[in-house]
Amino acid sequence: MPAATPALDALRDTLPDDLKDIRLNLGSVLTGENLQPAQALGVALAAARFVRCRPLADALESDTRAALADGAVATIADAVAAAGLMAMNTVYYRFRHMLGKESYEGRSPRLRMSRMAQPATSKLDFELMSLGCAALAGCELCIRNHEASLLHLGASEDACHDAVRIAAVVNAAACGLP
């Protein structure tokens, strides 16, 4: 059963008529059957923070607190961590991948990212959030690695697809908000 999102619904209603498709997508994208409500909300919140859209992030955080009760703290913490880590990782790994030089490939990144191995929710949930952010950044290497990790953890391709759909719609909604 999808989570109620009254704060997001109120914000969604402020999108202009020119973005009716985005308004409708924002109303439906969190209701898929391939992700649990906590996963869908976590991906959406991570995406909102990743694209630095404070109104969306605030609405999603409010709805996450209301919908998940005790589980909200972990989901919110992981969404914040995933957005922050992916903001760093997508720049670094996209740089290495785009250059394609062995001299860079062999170097240690020397960037801390231990939270990825010790999420507050689950490895699978954190990877879903990370995949959404990787797609937003267009980091091919990151997308491939997070999708492979998710499949290894037992997630379906449909779940991966839904996570990226959520991130895409959040990104589009951010464009229409002041």
Regions found by a protein language model. Name each.
Residues 1-41, 45-120, 149-152, 168, ...:
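Acidic, glycine/proline-rich low-complexity segments that act as flexible tails and inter-domain linkers
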Residues 107-141:
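Acidic/histidine-rich alpha-helical segments that form the ligand environment
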Residues 128-178:
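Preference for long, well-ordered alpha-helical segments
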